[in-house]
Regions:
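Flexible internal linker/loop segments at domain or repeat junctions
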Residues: 221-229
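Short alpha-helix
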Residues: 240-256
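Conserved N-terminal segment of class I S-adenosyl-L-methionine
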Residues: 1-185, 194-198, 204, 212, ...
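Conserved beta-strand signature within the Rossmann-like core of class I S-adenosyl-L-methionine
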Residues: 208-217
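Extracytoplasmic/secreted proteins and extracellular or luminal domains
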Residues: 175, 256-257
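Short "lid" loop at the C-terminus of a central beta-strand within the Rossmann-like core
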Residues: 22, 216-222, 242, 267
């Protein structure tokens, strides 16, 4: 793990921070840490009694407004966090800390109900039966144009069975193909270095390939305009470690030689929960 000293979207060096909590499931999954109760019989002179949680820091970039966790996890830690992601063992472990997760997870595994909205957004950007690569697409259940794409390839480390009509590909196989559409949906909010991911994705794109990028438009960003108030409101961190602004997304895309051709923020429902997402159509710049 590293502690971020610069913005992970625009590389700005002016960051403002506030103390926060790393949620118990994430702390346990990553480091084996659990909350502990400090009792009177500990005899701690300078430490108050109560439950001690895992501490971290919320950071905000003064330039692009990205709100993010200071902890940047390495590949081994990320593998531990997402091992068996949404599978039985993962769900059981998370249910222990977050009662009710298993029921919501079952809804998430069934797929989202707003795929038609995304396909409509992409209709003018890709052919009617596009060749699609879903980068980080898990089983492919949420891939736009699923069931009518000319090709439905999935590049993902999860190893979960894929939906009918899709195939899992490795990096070499994907790089040997030509795609009309590359999808990266609800991925980069989880990763330590989103610019690196977007640069990697750009390698799979040709000059006429469209990228569909989707990330949460988190309520704390969407509903709180004043930066200081927004930072103060972000007191805990879970699996989403990057809360994006439009400016942060533009900066991250630019670092990969990509530019947004269209961007909308709109309401969605997934896993029985209402939220907002940024939907972005991007292409290689120039």
């Amino acid at each position: 793990m590293k502690i971020a000293k610069r913005c992970v979207c625009c590389d700005g060096g002016q960051l403002t921070g506030r103390p926060a909590i790393l949620m118990p499931f994430v702390a346990h999954r990553l480091f084996g840490w659990e909350p502990v109760r400090v009792e009177a019989d500990w005899g701690m002179r300078d430490l108050p009694q109560g439950v001690a949680q895992s501490v971290c820091k919320s950071l905000m970039c003064d330039a692009c407004g990205l709100l993010f966790l200071d902890m940047r996890f390495d590949d081994e830690e990320m593998a531990a966090l997402y091992d068996d992601y949404r599978g039985p063992a993962y769900s059981a472990a998370r249910e222990r800390f977050e009662p009710g997760y298993t029921a919501r997870n079952a809804l998430l595994l069934d797929g989202s109900d707003y795929r038609a909205t995304i396909e409509s957004l992409l209709a003018d950007a890709v052919p009617a039966r596009p060749r699609v690569l879903d980068w980080g697409g898990d089983s492919g259940v949420n891939t736009p144009f699923r069931g009518r794409a000319a090709a439905h390839d999935i590049y993902d480390i999860s190893g979960r069975p894929v939906v009918d009509g899709a195939r899992r590909v490795n990096r070499a196989a994907a790089l040997s193909q030509s795609y009309d559409l590359v999808v990266c949906s609800n991925v980069i909010e989880h990763v330590s270095w989103p610019r690196d991911i977007l640069r990697d994705i750009a390698a799979f794109m040709g000059p006429r390939t469209a990228l569909y990028l989707e990330v949460p438009h988190e309520d704390v960003v969407r509903l709180i305009d004043e930066p200081g108030a927004r930072l103060a409101a972000k007191r805990h961190w879970h699996e989403h470690i990057n809360f994006f602004t439009a400016e942060a997304l533009d900066a991250a895309l630019a670092s990969a030689g990509l530019v947004a051709a269209a961007r909308v923020s709109h309401p969605v429902v997934a896993g029985g929960k209402a939220s907002h997402v940024f939907s972005i159509v991007a292409r290689k710049d120039g």
